[in-house]
Amino acid sequence: MSCRIDFTWDDEASVWIATSKDVPGLILESGSFDALIERVRYAVPELLELNSKPNKIVDLTFVSERHDQVVVYG
């Protein structure tokens, strides 16, 4: 089984948000990207178990997105 985990930076709240269409109920946030990955690694098995998914090894693919702006002086 493979699950895609999407990470999006919320500039207004200054946190990373993790969601997944493959893992119902997964919505986590953290100011630290690394800490959020660890939280996701613990939450995914629990959520899949709650959603009656059979026990097996799950491949996690992490996809991050962050938009930023810079000023170009010319």
Residue spans of the language-model regions?
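Short, charged, surface-exposed hinge/linker loops at domain edges
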Residues: 1-6, 34-74
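Short amphipathic alpha-helical segments
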Residues: 3, 22-24
